[in-house]
């Protein structure tokens, strides 16, 4: 229930709340949170929104501006399949001037220029260059097609295992509330025993 989830966030807001952090897709159970609903409520109260898209970016078809977040960080090595250590920072244009990198940006950098965050020192240029190839590959497949395939695979295995009465799925089966990841348990088994058996 999107309204109930949103209420859990809004009930924790106070007059002192300046920023809310929302995990778009929870990594351990695969549940998708109603990020835009929560963000809309936060904005009504003057609260900035940070959206963690580490497990949603490149997985399903959405656009960051449509979530109404002010800031977002993501790992590009997950569902976008870029190299390890690559990531992306998104800051809404009108918020850029309010944030500065921990390492000093060049003096020539304007305060409202997102490139002020690119002063990273020594880094892997090979990894950076490979991001473009990963984006190209993702675009060849297509976001919607990729999402449909991943949903099919998750639904396939969850439907198979739930035929066993000892198996329980703890992730929503509603496509609006989950995508690729699902959490399961087996009666009489500890989570670490399931992990050891499967992996």
Identify the residue ranges that each predicted region occupies.
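Pyridoxal 5′-phosphate
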Residues: 1-199
